[in-house]
From Swiss-Prot:
InterPro entries: Glyco_trans_31. It catalyses: a beta-D-Gal-(1->4)-beta-D-Glc-(1<->1)-Cer(d18:1(4E)) + UDP-N-acetyl-alpha-D-glucosamine = a beta-D-GlcNAc-(1->3)-beta-D-Gal-(1->4)-beta-D-Glc-(1<->1)-Cer(d18:1(4E)) + UDP + H(+); a neolactoside nLc4Cer(d18:1(4E)) + UDP-N-acetyl-alpha-D-glucosamine = a neolactoside IV(3)-beta-GlcNAc-nLc4Cer(d18:1(4E)) + UDP + H(+). This is Lactosylceramide 1,3-N-acetyl-beta-D-glucosaminyltransferase A. It is an enzyme of class 2 (transferase). It comes from the Eukaryota. The gene is b3gnt5-a. Pathway: Protein modification; protein glycosylation. Its EC number is 2.4.1.206. GO terms for cellular component: Golgi membrane.
Amino acid sequence: MLISARRLRRCQFLQLLASCFVLSLMALLVQEDNSLISHVKSYSYRYLINSYDFVNVSLSIPRDRLDGAASYRYLLNNRHICLNEDVLLLLFVKTAPENRRRRDAIRNTWGNEDFIRSQYDANIKVVFALGAEGDPVKSREIQQDLVNENKRFKDLIQQDFSDTFHNLTLKLLLQFGWVNSFCPSAKFIMSADDDIFVHTPNLVSYLKSLPIETQDFWIGRVHRGSPPIRRKTSKYYVPYEMYPWSSYPDYTAGAAYVVSRDVAAKVYEASQTLNTSLYIDDVFMGICANKMGLVPQYHVFFSGEGKSPYHPCIYNKMMTSHGHLDDLDYLWRQAIDPNVKSISSGFWGNLYCRFVNIMLLCRISYVDTYPCSAAWS
């Protein structure tokens, strides 16, 4: 009887433990904003159905009702930037009016057009896309500073919508609308945040290696089957009323991506018939692209939200790295150092960098920079 009682208590304990586990799991599953459930739903839709025609139809509106970028006035415009020039890459940097230091850092490093032209024989144009200061107390002074800045550098493109997170889609329309109107001959167009490091020499070399008439080209950090975030405290919260479906079409992270000029034209065309109230610009871009039958291509050296490891073996292949504010000058000097190429050259150099990249990128604790597969590329 003693043994039976012990066994009984043990069984009761295990049952209690199992019940607690099941109840805890149920409590998680019934939460509306549960991330696991959202991802299961979105991936199920992405891989079982994978059709977003109804999204395109639902978000389409007549042209006469579109509140697009065409209704916003240019406060600053440099329409002659591309005039009579053969431009390999037109690079838009999404910036805020008050971020002068970031713009200057970019001009002095990876956005230095003269350096790229002289050292890499490529004509790139770097322009800064922004809206207007929303604070009426600061707006006059900041706008005058922008006017003075533009007189000196002639690289600001500004419209009179309020420069806020919820107007990022308007900034996207500003970029593709400006390309369509003032620089349609640029072979490639890039959009990047102002806290991004772009390894322009690597990017230019890559773009120059592509066929002359490359079409349907769209590369970056691809998000596939991503669900809308329903958590109201999130910066990226999207209510059901705005987007009721369980999955977004495939899109590239808005931090940095590159498209060919035909893709820019197609996205702009699609944007003219879609509701622009969805304020997450990279998702809106994905919807526009999906409507035109465009598919993004994953490039392993376009970073996610994380910052690239500092190492010459990484610099040799990196395209972008996210989250750089005070270290652009240091990273730029390191990245273009002639010794970087020599470190990875030859059999032993390649083997050494392969080992280093595996150690840096193939971690159990994943950091959102480059995937482990980048170590083998």
